[in-house]
């Protein structure tokens, strides 16, 4: 009998790999990312960066950039044509009447503030992010306050175009 457990990924590695694959469906090249929500080692829902149904995607119509001014006074450009992978996954669960209470969310980078509020609101209890997000300090504080466990696998900030 052959022992293949040495080459077998952990559950977290498995779900992070699938999350990357889901991200291949993303339609904004600034942040092609995916999201998987899991409960009891079963996938509950997935999401990727994309426009709402019936609206043009960045890949088709180009980016819809808006300026954002950070608290420190620096300005950044943000594409607002699409919704984030985490938002899309939560919307998919809502459309199908699926509770996310007590589940784990896998994502490419730490969630933004808006995604963090949604994650808290739907009862997700753990977030596993592949990398750090450049503006995640408030998310970290919110998760700590809400009792959500945040695990960042790689101690590296995700880099993307026009960050």
Show which residues each predicted segment covers.
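Zinc-dependent deaminase catalytic domain
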Residues: 1-163
